[in-house]
Amino acid sequence: MIGLVGKKVGMTRIFTEDGVSIPVTVIEIEANRVTQVKGLENDGYTAIQVTTGAKKASRVTKPAAGHFAKAGVEAGRGLWEFRTAEGAEFTVGQSINVDIFADVKKVDVTGTSKGKGFAGTVKRWNFRTQDATHGNSLSHRVPGSIGQNQTPGKVFKGKKMAGQLGNERVTVQSLDVVRVDAERNLLLVKGAVPGATGSDLIVKPAVKA
């Protein structure tokens, strides 16, 4: 089953009939419009390309404008692709709505995490701090040794060090679907999802469900 592109509206909570409070993230999923259908013959795999939302005509590049015009679809705020099973029937210009999640119990949500700027190893990688006293001065939050000796004579790739924290693609798996509001194009999932309010999210049925 394909996924959909939505926008993070924010977090709130809803109550069950027993009065239990459930923290939920509200995701607005406007109709996803199919802009291209890819097939085995021409592309080597099967997929659909979709767009959602709207973008000012002055902000759409000429190649993108031609692509949208060819599909007969209003220019959206981006293009996303979802792989499809062979034999799945989709047509260019078709709209796919949030109600495809009506029978789905768990979803995977992908977004871009909030950027935190340059961060040290304690904040970024949960390193322990060094001694506050006992002869330690000026080295309380430094990482310590980052290598060995003349052999190997280098710092290994992937070594956990200070640097940019956040602002990367993150997927949270197996979030419970609490409610599907097809009238208002809303999907409520239990818990938090990556990214800032207003950021784009990709919602797919959970692979581990």
Curated annotation (Swiss-Prot):
MF terms (GO), sorted A to Z: rRNA binding; structural constituent of ribosome
Post-translational modification: Methylated by PrmB.
Keyword RNA-binding: yes
PROSITE patterns: RIBOSOMAL_L3 (PS00474)
GO biological process per UniProt: translation
Keyword terms: Methylation, Ribonucleoprotein, Ribosomal protein, RNA-binding, rRNA-binding
UniProt region (Disordered), positions on chain: 132-153
Main function: One of the primary rRNA binding proteins, it binds directly near the 3'-end of the 23S rRNA, where it nucleates assembly of the 50S subunit.
Database matches in HAMAP family: Ribosomal_uL3_B
Protein name: Large ribosomal subunit protein uL3
Designated gene of the protein: rplC
